[in-house]
Amino acid sequence: MTRRGLVGLDIDGTILLQDETLSPGVIEAVAEVRDAGYEVMLATGRSWMATRRYVEQLGLTADYAVCSNGAVTMRRDGDDWERWHVETFDPRTVLGLLGDRLPEARYMVELGS
């Protein structure tokens, strides 16, 4: 029986430098891990639009990518990708509580559309 494993990589501060270029040796290291029989995928806080280019640059063949801090899971569909799972919630309650306590703060909510 062949043993398989999964390696999940973050993007920011893990495979990328601050200038948004891949850290030296990342492409080669990912290829070595894949050649050793492991599946390599990305799991990141970034949106899919900001993640896809790194899936392509690294030549990843995994069928999934986890984006938006786990709120969106993308699944490969042939040569394209589809939203396989989207975790949503109504942010109004949380934003109301935060606004009461931190009225000068700014907040961002990512829309899955």
Where are each of the predicted segments found?
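Short, small/polar residue-rich loop motifs at catalytic or cofactor-binding pockets
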Residues: 2-4, 59-60
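Asp-based phosphoryl-transfer active-site loop
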Residues: 3-20, 42
